[in-house]
Amino acid sequence: MSTILVLGGSNGRTLEKLAKKRDCQVIFHDGKNHGGVKKTFRSVIKKCDVIVIQKGACGHVSIDVAKEYAKKYDVPLLFNQGFGGTGALEMGLKHLKAA
């Protein structure tokens, strides 16, 4: 089962419901820097197959840390221009099918 990390937004529960329907797993993080995200991101990025960042709903520090670990662990990093969870999930699934 594929695992997609979605960073940014506030729609974690919706994403989990959508992921069940599409036979994949979603890890969600709101993208806010709660005093440090390096430790959290390191562990979840190791577990995922692709990362989708919702650009309009994710802080710069979180984006920079995600880029760093995506490169380090060779995990594809995608940027969704909108805020919608459905769009982020579909983008991740499309990338995984193409790979």
Swiss-Prot record:
Belongs to the UPF0751 family. It comes from Bacillus anthracis. Pfam families: DUF2325 (PF10087). This is UPF0751 protein pXO1-84/BXA0114/GBAA_pXO1_0114. Keywords: Plasmid.
